[in-house]
Amino acid sequence: MTFISMTTKPLRPTLWIEQGQVFTWDQTRLPFEREVICLANSQDCARAIASMQVRGAPLIGAVAALGMAMAIREALAKHPGCYREAGWLDTLAKALLATRPTAVNLAWAVAQVSASVNAILQASTIDQEPPTQDLKGDRVNDSLRNRESKPTADSMATLLAEQAWQRALDLVDEDRSCNAAIGMQTQNVLMNNALMKHAHGHTASRPLQILTHCNAGALATVDWGTATAGIYQLHAQGIALHVWVDETRPRNQGASLTAYELADAGIPHTVIADNAGGLLMMRGLVDAVMVGCDRVCANGDVVNKIGTYLKALAAKAHGIPFWVACPASSIDMNCPSGMDVSIEERSALELSQIRGLPVHPQQTLRQPILVEIMQEGQICYNPGFDITPAALVSGLITEHALINPLKLREAFA
């Protein structure tokens, strides 16, 4: 993995590909250092996801897809005939799937790349013609279509590696367009919410007040974000709005990432302590809560960053809409409910230590440092996610439509 200082590069997009190489921000170094990492192989991709240099369900999915394509390319380069071995794709996927078990996008993206390769293997064995269509129904390029009817192991390996990489690139592009579409849906939801507020006596001159948790912004996706996509688009149209940003302990992704990217975009915002949201709602200072998610279960339960459930409870108590912005790929109809999700338990060090800049007046080189914030030996419990019951969710804002979480099975029937 290569590190590159890129202090002048725009923050968006979060991931880009140049000459076959994958680049993204090292999010563990933000907001104090803006550094790019180059993911050169499948191990780099797995390490970046596990270490949270790459985080956010959609971005994890994109990097996992690219990592799976790299793993396929690497395996075929080493042993061109390995595709004949039973379960070879499952073996290659294991390292990536083990990195972040809660995010359904990861497994979905890996499965998409694997399926594109399996489609070729099923349609083009040693004794059959190569396929003339890929999974999306598009005709494959001439160089692939004109291969011999009985391809060699080397030519088949090249074909499979090319197909895996192309499918991964398609998924990257799809994430970008998907989030833009979520933004359009979110605009309609938020503006309707604002009109309702104004109809009930709120002044039209007051900015639309949105509270968000963790980081479901552009940094959590290839571009735009999920929860922030509509915020970016409304801001670009000159709509007055203000965002309350939860700090989101213990990794402080709201304070260090969401606030950072909103500042970069010039969007008015205020960072608040995680426990301040309820008071703001009580005082009428929140018009809507907007979050992303790592998974939506078949019964409409939402799995998201720890602390989301408490925001949903407070919003329900004060009659404030609680929206979840997510791509359809985050909806897992194979998972019955939130109670069936494996919740990732993270290191106790995330609770006992905190990263920041020293503020000593004589400090000349202000480099980020880690400090202990509790007595050594304290027992810590650090679940990365919690479960928000479907009944607390006003709606799921996907790229296709606004969905009632209690009617999710009907929507996907």
What is each PLM-predicted segment?
Residues 37-53, 87, 207-212, 363-379:
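Short, hydrophobic/aliphatic alpha-helical segments
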Residues 33-44, 158-162, 206, 258, ...:
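Acidic-glycine-rich active-site phosphate/pyrophosphate-binding loop
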Residues 2-43:
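Positively charged, low-complexity intrinsically disordered leader regions
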Residues 51-123, 154-272:
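N-terminal active-site beta-alpha-beta segment that forms phosphate/nucleotide-binding
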Residues 139, 145-147, 206:
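Basic polycationic patches enriched in arginine
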Residues 36-42, 215-221, 298-304:
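Short, glycine-rich nucleotide/cofactor-binding loops
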Residues 237-241, 246-413:
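Conserved phosphate- and dinucleotide-binding cores of soluble alpha/beta proteins
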